[in-house]
Amino acid sequence: MEFEEDFSARADKDFLKMGRKSKKEKKEKENPNVGIFGMFRYADWLDKLYMVLGTLAAVLHGTSLPLLMLVFGNMTDSFTKAETSIWPNMTNQSEINNTEVISGSLEEDMATYAYYYTGIGAGVLIVAYIQVSFWCLAAGRQINKIRQKFFHAIMNQEIGWFDVHDIGELNTRLTDDVSKINDGIGDKIGMFFQSIATFLAAFIVGFISGWKLTLVILAVSPLIGLSSAMWAKVLTSFTNKELQAYAKAGAVAEEVLAAIRTVIAFGGQNKELERYNKNLEEAKNVGIKKAVTANISIGIAYLLVYASYALAFWYGTSLVLSNEYSVGQVLTVFFSILFGTFSIGHIAPNIEVFANARGAAYEIFKIIDNEPSIDSFSTQGHKPDSVMGNLEFKNVHFSYPSRSGIKILKGLNLKVQSGQTVALVGKSGCGKSTTVQLLQRLYDPTEGVVSIDGQDIRTINVRYLREIIGVVSQEPVLFATTIAENIRYGRENVTMDEIEKAVKEANAYDFIMKLPHKFDTLVGERGAQLSGGQKQRIAIARALVRNPKILLLDEATSALDTESEAVVQAALDKAREGRTTIVIAHRLSTVRNADVIAGFDGGVIVEQGNHEELMKEKGIYCRLVMMQTRGNEVELGSEADGSQSDTIASELTSEEFKSPSVRKSTCRSICGSQDQERRVSVKEAQDEDVPLVSFWGILKLNITEWPYLVVGVLCAVINGCMQPVFSIVFSGIIGVFTRDDDPKTKQQNCNLFSLFFLVMGMICFVTYFFQGFTFGKAGEILTKRLRYMVFKSMLRQDISWFDDHRNSTGALTTRLASDAANVKGAMSSRLAGITQNVANLGTGIIISLVYGWQLTLLLVVIAPLIILSGMMEMKVLSGQALKDKKELEVSGKIATEAIENFRTVVSLTREQKFENMYAQSLQIPYRNALKKAHVFGITFSFTQAMMYFSYAACFRFGAYLVAHQIMTFENVMLVFSAVVFGAIAAGNASSFAPDYAKAKVSASHIIRIMEKIPSIDSYSTRGLKPNWLEGNVKFNEVVFNYPTRPDIPVLQGLSLEVKKGQTLALVGSSGCGKSTVVQLLERFYDPMAGTVFLDGKEIKQLNVQWLRAHLGIVSQEPILFDCSIAENIAYGDNSRVVSQDEIERAAKEANIHQFIESLPDKYNTRVGDKGTQLSGGQKQRIAIARALVRQPHILLLDEATSALDTESEKVVQEALDKAREGRTCIVIAHRLSTIQNADLIVVIQNGKVKEHGTHQQLLAQKGIYFSMVQAGAKRL
C-alpha cells in the first residue's frame, strides 16, 4: 500500500521537474522496490484463488517432511530396540529362537511404517502438483496483464514524457524486467511457502518431541535468520543497480541497431561497441559485488547450521545417557530442526528471485502509475457535433520539456478561418513544426491558448481532436506491414475502394500496382523497402483516407521528385478544398497559392498576407522567394517549345512507373512479401531449426573463465561430498547408541563426532564462499562477454541481414537482452548446484556400496525413476522455452515499432490498435504458460513423491536386512542418509530444468550468430588498402536486385563513370535506383552482375573499412544519436579523436554553428532519440557537418538539402559546393536547381542510364531532363 499511495500522491506532479528531488524521492532512489503485496496488484479473484490454494498446498507439502520425521523417530526406536536385542543374544538356541521372534516383530512394525511413508507420499503427489501448477497459472495470468498494462501505460504517455525518457530502456523493461517479475511471482513463491511451512512445522515437531534439545538448537537460529535478512536487503540494492546498467546497455543497442546504416557508413561499430561495453562493465561490477555479498551470507549460514548440529548431538547425547530422551526422540528433533534450517537455505534463492522481481517491478509500476497531463485514452472532454475548422493561436508561448530554458514560441498570434489554407514559412527551427504539434495537443503551451471554433482545445476530448486532424510529416513513418494496412492506419473500417481512391489522389497507385503483391506488399521496418518519395505518397494517402476537417502538411512533398510533386501537389490542392489547412514548406513554389502566408521569425509571426501582398512588402517571405527563384532560373533557350515540353512531361509521368524498379525502395523483400507474411511461422521455424547446444557446448562459451570454473567446481565437489561425510558422522553417532559401551565412552565418541560437525561447518564457510564467488564472477564475465560478442556479431553483418524481417530492431534487442542472461542462468549458480548434486549423489552411492551394497542396489533401482521424471520435465520445458522465445520476439517487434514511432501512432490515434496487436501477440505465450504450469506441476510432484516412496522401500528392506543380520542399523542409516539425501538433491536439480532449457535455446542462437560470417564483412582485414585514392568511380553493366526481393529488378545493366574531382548528379523519378547506386558504392550490397570500379580497381578487392573511410554520406532522412551535438558531428570520423576546433569548423561550413551557440549547453546539448529535439533542417545540417568532418575523398549527397529552408539551403549549398572542390561527388536531388552546376548529370530510368551530359547539353536534347526542368520552372 505504501508504494501505491506514494505514486498516487505524485501522480499529478509535473514529470518535467526532474532536477528537483524531495527527501522522499531520494529515499525511494536508495531503496527502489515495490511492496510485497504491491507485486500482486493485478491479481483478480481467480488468481487470488489459485494463489490461496497454491499456498495451502505448499504449506501441506512443507509439513510432510516434519511429519515424516515423527514416523522416522518411532521407527528408529523400533530398530534400536530390535538391534540391541538381536546382535548380542546369539549364544544358544533359545536366544536364537527369541531373536527370530524379535526379527518378525521388527518386520511387521516396518511394514506399518512403510504404509505411513506411502500415504504421505501420495498426499505429496497431489499437493505438490497443486502448489506448483496453481502458482504458475496465477503468475502466467498476472504477467499477461502486466505486459498489457505496461504497454498501455507507455502508449498513454504524452510526447513530453518521451522527450525525457530513454525509449531503448522501455523496450528492455518490456522484455527483460517483465520476465524477472514472472520469475518472482510464480512457482518460487510456492517454494517459499513450502520452505516456511517446513521450518515452522519442523520446530513444532521438535518442541513436541523434545523441547529441551529444540531450545538449545534454537539458540543458533536467530543468527541464521539475521544473516538471511541482511543478505536480502543488500541483494535488492545491487539487483536494482544491475538492472539499471543493463537497461542503459539495451538502450544503446536499440539505438544503434535502429540506425545500422548510419553506423556502418561511418564505421562507428567500434565506438558503439565501446559505448555498449561501458554499460556492460558497470553491470558486471555490480553483479560481482552481488555474488560476493550473497555467498559470504550463504557461507555464514552453513557454518551456523553445522554448528547447530554439533551443539544438538553434544547435548542430545547427554539427554540419552541420562535416559530423558530415547535415540528416536533425539533423531526426530535433530532431523526436524535439520530440515527446518535447510528450508531456510531454500528460502534464500527464492528471496533472491523475488527481490529481483521487486526491483524490476519498481520502474514498471512507476510508469504504469504515471498519469499524463494529456491523456489520449481519456473519455472526458467536449466532442462537438460538427467542426467548422476556425483556428486561433492567442499569445502562445512554448518551450520543449527537455530544453525548458529555450523558448521556441514567444507570443504567437495566428488566426485561420474555416476552409482557409495558411502557409507557415521561415528558417529551420523558428517554430513552424511546433505550431502544428501544439494544434494536435502533442504538447500544451506554457502560456496562451490554442482554440478551434473558439473553444480551447484543452477542453476538447484529445482523441476526438486528433481524429479530425490529418497530418503528413516531413519524415513520414510507415509501419512494418502491408501498404493497404499502412493506409488503413489513417482510419479504421476504411474500404478497399476508399484506399484505392486515396492512393490515386496521392499519385501512388501506379507504382503500387507494379509490385508483385500490389496493396499486400510488405513495406519493411519504418517503410525501409520503399524510397523516400514512395513513403511520402503513402503517408499522404493515409492522411487523405482520414477525410480530416483540418489538414496539416509539414513538408509533405519534400521527398518527391519534380514530376511526382506536381501531381501530388495538385492532389493536395484538391484535398484542401473545404478543409482548413496549415502548410509548412521550404519549397515556396508549393505555398504561393495559399490564402494566407505567415512569416515566422524568433518564435512570432512578423508578417501575414497572400503571395502578392507579401512580395510587395519586401520582407522575410519576399527575400526567401527571391533567393529560391534565382536558384531556379534556368536557360531554357529560345527554342523551348512549351507544348512540346508539356507532351514530354505527360509522357514522363506515365513512363515514370513503367520501371518495375523501386529504389531503397525496391530494396528488400517486397517480392514474396505476402507469402512471407503467410509463411512467417514456417520460415521462423526453419530459422529456429538449429541443433540445440549440448551442455558441453554451453560450457565452451564459458571456457575462458576456466580458472574460476575449476576452483568453483572443486568447491562445489567438496560441498557435494559434505552430505555423504555427514552420513558417515551421523551413522557413527547412531552406532554409539546401538553398541553396549559404557556411558563415558559413548559421551567421548559423541563429543568427537560433534567436533567433526563443527570442522565441516568451517570448511563449508570457505568452500561455499569460493564456490559462489568464482561461479558468480565467471557468470558475470560470461554475460558481459556474450552480450558484447553477440552485439559485435550483429554489427558485423551486412545490410541484407538486417533487411530480413526476422532481424528487426525489436527482435534483435529482445534476443540481446535475454539470450546471454539465459545462458548465465544455467552456467553460474545453476552449474554450481548441479556439480554439487552430482558429487553428492555419486559419493553417496560409492560410500553406500561399501557399507551395504544390497540396500544401495534397491535405492539405485529407484533413482532412474527420479532422473527420468527430471528428464521428461526438461524436454517438455525446453520445447516451451523455444516457443515462448519465438512468440515473445513477435510481441517485442510490435512494441518496439510502436514505441519508436510513437509520434506517428499518436497523430493517427492508433494507440488502441497497437495495444490490440500487442495483446493478440501475447496470446500464444500466454496459452503456453498455462500449459507449462500443468506440465511443471506433474513432473515436480512426481519427483517429490518419489522420495517418500523410496523411504518406504528403503526402511522396509532395511528391516529385513537388519532382522536377518545382513546389515547393522548403523549401516542402514548411513546408506539411507547418503543415497536418499543425495537423491533429494538430484530431485531438486530438476528445478534447474527450465533455466537449462532456456539456456540451450539461447546458446544455439548465440553460437549461430557468432559463427555467421557475412558476405560483406565489415571487420575483415583482407583487401587492398591503396596509399592514395584519386576518386575515379565507374559502374560497368551493373545488374542488381535486393536480396529480399529477388524478383524485382532495380538496376538493369547500369553503366556510368565519374572522373576524379567531378560532380555527378543522378536524377530520375522516385524508385528508379538512384540511392541504390550510392548503396552499392558504400558496399552495403554487392551487384549480382557487372562491376563497380574505384580508381580502376574492383571495389570487392578493396578492404571494406578502408573503402568506407574515404566516403562521406548525407542521407535524405539523417539519423542522429541520443548524445550531444558535438559527439554527433565527431561521429563523422570514428578513426580518431576529432578536436573541438574541427567540429566547430564543420558546423560553420554547414551553417549550424550560430544556432548551436544560441543553445544554453551549446555543443553539449543532447539531441534526443533520433534527433527529436531538433527540427528537420537542423538535423540535416548537423548530418552535413558530420560528413564534412570526415574529410572524405568521395562525397555522397542523397537529397542533402531537402529538409532545409530556402535561406539555409542557399548557405549550405554554397558550403557543399565548396566542400566538393577537389573531391569526387555524387549528388541525388529532386530539386534540380541544386545540381545545375554538376559536371555530369545522369538521368536514370528503368534501372539504366537514359541521358547524360551537362545541364546545358541535356536541355538542348529536350528529353526527359528538359521536361523535368520545365515542369519545375512552370510552377514558380
UniProtKB/Swiss-Prot annotation:
Energy-dependent efflux pump responsible for decreased drug accumulation in multidrug-resistant cells. Keywords: ATP-binding, Glycoprotein, Membrane, Nucleotide-binding, Phosphoprotein, Repeat, Translocase, Transmembrane, Transmembrane helix, Transport. It catalyses: ATP + H2O + xenobioticSide 1 = ADP + phosphate + xenobioticSide 2. The gene is PGY2. This is Multidrug resistance protein 2. GO terms for molecular function: ABC-type oligopeptide transporter activity; ABC-type xenobiotic transporter activity; ATP binding; ATP hydrolysis activity. Residues 1-51, 346-708, 993-1276 are cytoplasmic. The keyword Phosphoprotein applies. Belongs to the ABC transporter superfamily. ABCB family. Multidrug resistance exporter (TC 3.A.1.201) subfamily. One of its GO terms (cellular component) is mitochondrial inner membrane. Residues 51-356, 709-998 form the ABC transmembrane type-1 domain. ATP 2 binds at G1068, S1069, S1070, G1071, C1072, G1073, K1074, S1075. Residues 391-627, 1033-1271 form the ABC transporter domain. The modification Phosphoserine is found at S22. It comes from Cricetulus griseus. It is found in: Membrane.
